[in-house]
């Protein structure tokens, strides 16, 4: 998608409040990708993305900015926690798995796009498969009259199938079952083995299953995709997308920084993870199920709160690979108020829509919203700062009784005012010990 940095920031403003610096830096980084692709192949190889380090406490919008952009622009995106690589008992276990995860994300992205493009062909394939079970083909040598009758019956059945009249009927279908797909705990390295067994024709089998037609339609989608779509071109496109448009968001990078003031036995492990990350961020080749993926032009966005450490506590080589740094602002009551009112699908709108399913119209008056924001802000100041996530806890506590008794208010309008907010939350926020457990 060809968007200017200003257009990117404008899009983000609908979902993330404030954080202008972070939005600007990411918008420029993404626009530079588009600019790079307009250059000659020789020059493209030399221009590497400027990786970004985002510094800010939890709940201020670090992940949301990157996730929203990747989704809007159709980029392969994954989020991983750097800290998980120190929890396994030995240094840097499978740090390359983040690249394999990105390859899978790119593959799914391209597959979904191709399925959408070829929707009519896929639907026709599924339709014919189901019709074969409902009305088996006639044997050879049947009279023209019988063939005409069969054709008419088939078209009537097809119309019923398309209209959903047969959705609750039960049929027996054959679906392919791969032995690798049945075990979700197999490591990502098995992707290459999966491709080999497909070629030699083992590892998968046809399984007969009885199910409703509406379920059969979904079950046959994968088989239809395998038969109709060009799998090699999908892999090739996915590899290209992952290499040139992929974004890896490394959260909690501060947890693997070795604080100069805090030396403990985990420090060698933390530094080991940093050194394992280094070649991937610098640019290396990683074997994935879609081929050898070069990480040279993947955009890495690292993020952390850095409460107990500083960015300078990362090893110098890794610091140098994240030249763009941006500090995200903490959220005060004004920012929290905007978060509750401005975004397209704000938290208050979500709760209103949920209760609308119970035929209850829920509204919040402006003073009540300001009071909710103040209480959330105060809770963040007096306890751990968890940013906008505090709003979820506060609103859940506020609406707890109403959600429980929603059926009693069916057909009515319920307005949350400042008085209700003070009654429900005032005593809790004043009692700090209680607030720590509830808010």
From Swiss-Prot:
HAMAP family noted in UniProt: HslU
The entry's keywords: ATP-binding, Chaperone, Cytoplasm, Nucleotide-binding, Stress response
GO terms for cellular component: HslUV protease complex
Predominant place of localization: cytoplasm
Sites where the protein binds ATP: 17, 59-64, 251, 317, 389
One example of a Gene Ontology biological process annotation: proteolysis involved in protein catabolic process
InterPro entries tied to this protein: AAA+_ATPase, ATP-dep_Clp_protease_ClpX, ATPase_AAA_core, Clp_ATPase_C, HslU, P-loop_NTPase
Pfam families: AAA (PF00004), AAA_2 (PF07724), ClpB_D2-small (PF10431)
Function: ATPase subunit of a proteasome-like degradation complex; this subunit has chaperone activity. The binding of ATP and its subsequent hydrolysis by HslU are essential for unfolding of protein substrates subsequently hydrolyzed by HslV. HslU recognizes the N-terminal part of its protein substrates and unfolds these before they are guided to HslV for hydrolysis.
Subcellular location: Cytoplasm
The protein's name: ATP-dependent protease ATPase subunit HslU
Keyword Transmembrane helix annotated: no
Gene3D superfamilies in alphabetical order: 1.10.8.60, P-loop containing nucleotide triphosphate hydrolases
Any GO molecular function: proteasome-activating activity
Subunit structure: A double ring-shaped homohexamer of HslV is capped on each side by a ring-shaped HslU homohexamer. The assembly of the HslU/HslV complex is dependent on binding of ATP.
Family: Belongs to the ClpX chaperone family. HslU subfamily.
PANTHER family: ATP-DEPENDENT CLP PROTEASE ATP-BINDING SUBUNIT CLPX-LIKE, MITOCHONDRIAL-RELATED (PTHR48102), ATP-DEPENDENT PROTEASE ATPASE SUBUNIT HSLU (PTHR48102:SF3)
Keyword presence, Chaperone: yes
């Amino acid at each position: 998608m060809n968007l200017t940095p200003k257009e990117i920031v404008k899009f983000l403003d609908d979902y993330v409040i404030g954080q202008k610096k972070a939005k600007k830096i990411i918008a420029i980084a993404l626009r530079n990708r588009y600019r790079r692709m307009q250059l000659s192949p020789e020059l493209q190889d030399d221009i590497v993305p400027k990786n970004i380090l985002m510094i800010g406490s939890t709940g201020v919008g670090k992940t949301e900015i990157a996730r929203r952009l990747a989704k809007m622009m159709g980029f392969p995106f994954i989020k991983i926690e750097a800290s998980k690589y120190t929890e396994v008992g030995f240094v840097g276990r499978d740090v390359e798995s983040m690249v394999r995860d990105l390859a899978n994300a790119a593959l799914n992205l391209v597959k979904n796009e191709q399925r959408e493009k070829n929707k009519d062909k896929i639907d026709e394939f599924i339709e014919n498969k189901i019709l074969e079970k409902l009305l088996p083909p006639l044997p050879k040598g049947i009279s023209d009259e019988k063939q005409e009758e069969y054709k008419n019956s088939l078209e009537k059945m097809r119309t019923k199938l398309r209209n959903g009249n047969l959705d609750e009927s039960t049929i027996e279908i054959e679906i392919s079952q791969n032995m690798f797909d049945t075990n979700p705990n197999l490591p990502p390295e098995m992707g290459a083995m999966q491709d080999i067994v497909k070629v030699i024709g083992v590892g998968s089998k046809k399984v007969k299953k009885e199910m409703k037609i509406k379920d059969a339609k979904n079950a046959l989608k994968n088989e239809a995709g395998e038969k109709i779509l060009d799998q090699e071109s999908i892999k090739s496109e996915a590899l290209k997308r992952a290499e040139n448009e992929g974004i890896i968001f490394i959260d909690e990078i501060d947890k693997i920084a070795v604080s100069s003031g805090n030396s403990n036995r985990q420090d060698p492990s933390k530094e080991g993870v940093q050194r394992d990350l280094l070649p991937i961020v610098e640019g290396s080749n990683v074997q994935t199920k879609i081929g050898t993926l070069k990480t040279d032009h993947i955009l890495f966005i690292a993020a952390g709160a850095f409460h107990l450490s500083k960015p300078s506590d990362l090893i110098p080589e890794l610091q140098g690979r994240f030249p763009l740094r941006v500090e995200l602002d903490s959220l005060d009551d004004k920012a929290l108020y905007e978060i509750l009112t401005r975004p397209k699908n704000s938290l208050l709108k979500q709760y209103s829509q949920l209760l609308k399913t119970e035929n209850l119209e829920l509204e919040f008056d402006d003073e009540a919203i300001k009071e909710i924001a103040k209480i959330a802000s105060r809770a963040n100041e007096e306890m751990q700062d968890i940013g906008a996530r505090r709003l979820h806890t506060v609103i859940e506590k506020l609406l707890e009784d109403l959600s429980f008794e929603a059926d009693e208010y069916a057909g009515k309008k319920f307005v949350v005012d400042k008085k209700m907010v003070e009654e429900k939350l005032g005593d809790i926020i004043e009692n700090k010990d209680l607030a720590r457990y509830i808010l």
